[in-house]
């Protein structure tokens, strides 16, 4: 048995309707996310124990520490595993709309307004062909906030 398991959904598959239908959520959870979980575990089994013992975020943040012949599989499947986990945990029923609090302040400071952020996010991620992810990312070292896109499909926003 591998280290990672398919996380339980924090809400029902139909909770995001009408924006995302229940069947799409179920397929992404039980098929896609499960496949990333299984393939990540299979790739990690072939790595040294010190890699296997790390958290996926630590592995993805230091992907060069992974044996070269395993990097691509771990980067791809670890990214797919964690991107889905982030997605499930950042969506909620009756969510959406303009944020408040510190995230709203940070968006305003970095992009001018929430409307400007949405425009930047949309224009940056619209060029992703096929599968891919777009993220609002924050670098605590430089305090930079930016919209990141990952065109290499499900790889990680952590590197």
What are these model-predicted stretches?
Residues 1-149:
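Feature for soluble, non-membrane regions of globular proteins
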Residues 148-159:
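Positively charged, low-complexity/disordered segments
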């Amino acid at each position: 048995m591998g280290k990672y398991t398919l996380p339980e959904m924090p809400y029902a598959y139909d909770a995001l309707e009408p924006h995302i239908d229940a069947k799409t959520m179920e397929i992404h959870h039980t098929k896609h996310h499960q496949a990333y979980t299984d393939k990540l575990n299979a790739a990690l089994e072939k790595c040294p124990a010190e890699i296997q013992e790390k958290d996926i975020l630590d592995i993805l943040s230091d992907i060069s520490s992974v044996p070269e012949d395993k990097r691509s599989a771990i980067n791809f499947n670890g990214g797919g595993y964690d991107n889905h986990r982030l997605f499930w945990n950042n969506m909620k029923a009756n969510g959406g709309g303009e944020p408040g609090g510190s995230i709203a302040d940070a968006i305003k400071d970095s992009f001018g307004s929430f409307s400007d952020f949405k425009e930047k996010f949309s224009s940056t991620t619209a060029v992703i062909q096929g599968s891919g992810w777009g993220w609002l990312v924050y670098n605590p070292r430089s305090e930079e906030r930016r919209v990141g896109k990952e065109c290499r499909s499900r790889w990680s926003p952590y590197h």
